[in-house]
Amino acid sequence: VHDVPVPKGGGVPVFLGSVAAMMVFLPLDGHLIAIILAGLLLVSVGVWDDASDISPILRLLVNFLAAGIVIGAGIGIAYITNPFGSGVIHLNQPQLSFNFLGEQRSIWLLADLLALLWIPFMINAVNWSSGLDGQIAGVVPIAAATIGILSFRFSADVTQWPVAIAAFSLAGAFLGYLPYSFYPQKSMPGYGGAGYAGFMLAVLAILSTTKVGTAMVVLGVPLIDAVYVGVSRI
């Protein structure tokens, strides 16, 4: 509870800062365009929600739409580590192939479905854990930097460099916002900032070789809190 009104638009500068860094250091390919568009959608709806308190159902639909944008760009959970032994479990089957505008396309049903569930879950998990001053601005840089550092372990794999750069861009944006988030807060990240943070961490976990397991370990406390909140509200 705040004694004086506190603006909730902190997600806007965080979004602009991270996107500016990514556009400077990364090629503007299909993945990055989809991430920017989905992030812009989440932040815009978040600002709208903070101002007008829109329907939770509409917010959830927007979460799935944001997930659908990046999935449509080819971002999906192609495999997961086998919890019952060594190796991985591939999720690239079954596939639904079709012709679109003269090009052969395919949908990996399991991979895309898992991503469609994982991304909205992370968006809401991070948002539900944003109740304390400085919590989001402190947790997100740690999680993003961890993904970035682990991506550097595979520096010989050139596909991991963009993941590391995007992760450090997100971490830097939230670190820059951190002084304004300490008690007493001068600004709140709001639904837009928290939703964008959860979205980016979910996507980075998918794109990195560490996959979702790393995000679940780094964000263990917020994820457990999210499950508790979800169960308590049923």
Question: Which residues make up each language-model segment?
Answer:
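"…together with the soluble PPM/PP2C metallo-phosphatase catalytic core" -> "…together
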Residues: 1-229
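Juxtamembrane non-transmembrane "cap" segments at the membrane-aqueous interface
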Residues: 232-234
